[in-house]
């Protein structure tokens, strides 16, 4: 079942920019925080998780991309970006990511 934010996160005023995502409790390294973006065809949708995360050059989460394959051979494109913690995150710490969709 889809939830806008995991129970371990909340939205608060950020020292980085505007609002940000913050840990309500300790989050262990390797935790899947959920879906941040979904691409259907040419349209990219941002979830609340993706909408409130701020940039950092030293992020504590990274994105993983899941590309769905349609075995019925009906034409569609489907990609899902999830956020995975790179290290243990302390309660009260802001969740950040490096803003890129590709590497150069």
Which residues does each PLM region occupy?
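Conserved catalytic SET/PR domain of SAM-dependent protein methyltransferases, capturing the structural core
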Residues: 1-104
């Amino acid at each position: 079942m889809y939830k806008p934010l995991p129970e371990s996160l909340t939205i608060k005023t950020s020292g980085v920019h505007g609002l940000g995502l913050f840990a309500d409790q300790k989050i262990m390294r390797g935790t899947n925080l959920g879906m941040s973006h979904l691409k259907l065809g040419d349209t990219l949708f941002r979830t609340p998780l993706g909408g409130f995360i701020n940039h950092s050059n030293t992020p504590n989460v990274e994105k993983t991309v899941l590309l769905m394959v349609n075995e019925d051979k009906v034409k569609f494109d489907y990609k899902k970006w999830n956020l995975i913690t790179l290290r243990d995150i302390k309660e009260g710490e802001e969740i950040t990511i490096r803003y890129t969709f590709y590497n150069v």
